[in-house]
């Protein structure tokens, strides 16, 4: 099952990608933020109203010795979050967390994206 995050306008979104060494034990991370009515940036993970801005962080500390296919999977997974796809437990989805062999969106992912952005 997919869960979606609400974007106000498609053309308001901005995603930045950072590839660096982080001491944490995650491969990749989607870090959404939003601007409030005063223009202040907020990183409150409990606010699901507008995550049209965000950073993707790829952790070289964890993935530097992994295959290029695995690195691509992590990047595609995090980009899925930037398109408002959440984790799901579908075995045939790039959005399933953990070790998977998929490094590109699968049929279910594409269907959910089409439904989300029509």
Region annotations inferred by a language model:
Residues 69-70, 74-78, 90, 108-115:
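Extracytoplasmic/secreted proteins, especially bacterial periplasmic and envelope-associated proteins
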Residues 96-118:
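Post-HExxH zinc-binding segment in Zn-dependent metallohydrolases
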Residues 56-62, 91-101:
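Surface-exposed aromatic
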Residues 1-76, 82, 86:
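Metzincin-family zinc-dependent endopeptidase catalytic domain
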């Amino acid at each position: 099952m997919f869960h979606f995050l609400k974007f106000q306008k498609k053309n308001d979104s901005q995603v930045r990608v950072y590839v660096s060494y982080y001491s944490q034990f995650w491969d990749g991370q989607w870090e959404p933020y939003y601007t409030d009515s005063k223009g202040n940036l907020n990183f409150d993970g409990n606010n699901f109203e507008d995550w049209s801005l965000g950073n993707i962080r790829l952790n070289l500390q964890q993935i530097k010795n992994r295959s290029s296919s695995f690195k691509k999977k992590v990047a595609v997974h995090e980009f899925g979050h930037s398109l408002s796809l959440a984790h799901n437990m579908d075995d045939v989805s790039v959005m399933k967390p953990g070790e998977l062999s998929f490094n590109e969106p699968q049929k279910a992912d594409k269907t959910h994206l089409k439904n989300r952005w029509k």
